[in-house]
Design a protein with these regions (language model features):
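S-adenosyl-L-methionine
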Residues: 1-43, 54-55
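Conserved SAM-binding motif I beta-strand of class I
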Residues: 63-70, 137
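A short acidic, Gly/Pro-enriched loop at the edge of an enzyme's catalytic core
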Residues: 93-106
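Non-catalytic substrate-recognition/targeting regions of SAM-dependent transferases
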Residues: 1-16, 139-163
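Conserved SAM-binding loop
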Residues: 77-80
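Conserved SAM-binding loop of SAM-dependent methyltransferases across substrates and taxa
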Residues: 51-63
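A short glycine-rich, Lys/Arg-flanked "PGG" loop and its adjoining helix->strand segment in the class I
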Residues: 118-134
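A short SAM/SAH-binding and catalytic strip from SAM-dependent methyltransferases
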Residues: 105-119
């Protein structure tokens, strides 16, 4: 994957023989590019549902806090940090029921297929973000459901959709 004029070496975990499957998606790329446009310097950044750690690796210079939901996500992110020469000790993470980062400025969320899991993420982010925080969400178009927007509107005043 290329981000901010750098090539990032990413692989799926567990590994797969299917070469058409990548460790990142167009949603990751769109979320990252949009976030870059907001300015990331001196911002507290949270990452949610970063399945293989693509966003964690891409934003490693900004010390993002990853919210991890399962062991394979944890292993994949550690693997990809190591594959890119990044120290795993500097990487902070917690689970969505006990987010260890507060006053988040920008949250990047790849929306899961489950509306219930999305609602948990949004609910927890709402509790840890500031009133002026920005939450950028991305998803695979084929998985879209209007329910996601309805859920976001339960917690936030300004909910908009693009692309």
């Amino acid at each position: 994957m290329r981000f901010n004029n750098k090539t990032i070496n990413l692989q799926r975990y567990p590994n797969t023989a299917n070469r058409s499957l990548r460790a990142w998606s167009a949603a990751d790329e769109l979320i990252l590019e949009t976030a870059l446009g907001l300015g990331l310097e001196k911002k507290k950044i949270a990452l949610m549902h970063d399945t293989f750690g693509a966003m964690a690796v891409a934003l490693s210079t900004h010390n993002p806090h990853s919210i991890i939901t399962n062991a394979s996500q944890l292993k994949a992110t550690k693997l990809n940090l190591a594959n890119n020469g990044l120290d795993k000790k500097d990487w902070e993470h917690s689970n969505p029921l006990n987010i260890q980062s507060t006053d988040i400025d920008i949250a990047l969320l790849k929306i899961p297929k489950s509306a219930d899991l999305f609602q948990l993420y949004i609910q927890q982010l709402h509790a840890t973000c500031k009133s002026e925080s920005v939450i950028l969400c991305g998803f695979m178009t084929r998985n879209f459901t209007a329910r996601w927007k309805e859920i976001a509107e339960l917690y936030f005043d300004d909910v908009s959709q693009s692309m």
